[in-house]
Amino acid sequence: MRTIQLRRYTLVDGEYDAFLAWWDEWMPRVRSAAGFVIEFAYGIRETNEFVWAVSAEGDHEAFIATEQAYMVSPERAEAFDGMPKQVAEYNIRFADDVRIAGVTG
């Protein structure tokens, strides 16, 4: 069983490219080291949006425990050290695993 968290960000105007460069440099490495899998990541330049999903083994409670350990990790602290405010709004929710007939993935 995996738990998936959908993360939708509205970025600060003018920070789209800088945020993507930062995210690409840090998040795959730091999240993976903490036990997460990045399922996908998409940017929508026209609306300054960035949408991605991260998952971890286990149920909702296991995900939260993994997330709590990640939040206080030195790797995360290094990734965010000196980072300017680039996200104006966060929308973070757990996603249901919905199986649709005829759709693979």
Predicted segment positions?
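Short, surface-exposed beta-edge/turn micro-motifs
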Residues: 2, 49-50
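Active-site-flanking beta-strand signature of metal-NTP-handling nucleotidyl enzymes
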Residues: 4-8
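Short hydrophobic/aromatic beta-strand micro-patches
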Residues: 10, 53-55
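Residues that cap or initiate secondary-structure elements
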Residues: 13-15, 58-60, 98
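An amphipathic, aromatic/His-enriched active-site/gating alpha helix that lines ligand/cofactor pockets
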Residues: 18-40, 55-93
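Extended hydrophobic/Leu-rich segments
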Residues: 26, 48-49
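Long, low-complexity, Ser/Thr/Gly/Pro-rich intrinsically disordered segments that act as flexible linkers
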Residues: 43-48, 84-105
